[in-house]
Amino acid sequence: RHMLELEELKLVEQFEFDGYLLLNGGYCTIGSQIIYDNKIPQEDLKEIVKIVKENNYPCLFIESNQMYITHVNQRVIDAQASISTMIPPISNQINIDNIYQVDPYVDEKGIKEIIKNTKHVKVTKWHDYAYDIVPKTGGKAAAIQAVSKHFGYQKEELMAFGDGHNDIEMLDVVGYPIVMENGSDEVKQHACYICDDVEKEGILKGLKHFNLID
């Protein structure tokens, strides 16, 4: 998630956290301090942008302080609705110096075409027609390890909640990997505990199950 999305969902107003692991782990902060920062290399972004423009793919580009999409179609509308997030503003002015994540709204053939000439990125799927492209050295697991190192935590002291394919690497680096009931069977294979769906207060119930809150 982007901080703009957390603000849109009013999560920042409701809860005060010590830090945030944002943009699939590409941008992590503790208070006002940036402790992890991992952008997509420019050489790969140039290749991605070239293919996106040639094929007129709808694609979301995410910077630390803003995000924008090339254009909108039904795939974009459906994918954004599935995560309760508004559609970002449309722009074709892409700043390749400051991109942390790229989200193409395409099928499997499309994503293969987009990354065919890249060397330093990896892909995870979060919707039937939506993917995350992030640095190969980054991701949620790398971010958790950076935060863990910052605080001196051990793996056994860490807990993470997830429900999507793009959460698997994160679940594998914590001592308490918890998967939501709505997660796929593949994701659930990485869990030590299955909690209820998000809509049924699954995270709250999971925290109570492990006696972290009353």
Give the positions of each predicted feature.
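Active-site phosphate-binding/coordination module
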Residues: 1-75
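Hydrophobic/aromatic beta-strand patches that form the interior of the parallel beta-sheet core
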Residues: 21, 159-161, 178, 195
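Short, structured coil segments at secondary-structure junctions
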Residues: 15-16, 24, 117-119, 173-174, ...
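Well-formed, non-transmembrane alpha-helical positions, independent of function
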Residues: 10-11, 169-173
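Asp-based, Mg2+/Mn2+-dependent phosphohydrolase catalytic module
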Residues: 173, 178-214
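Conserved acidic, metal-coordinating active-site core of Asp-based
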Residues: 51, 55-58, 62-170, 182
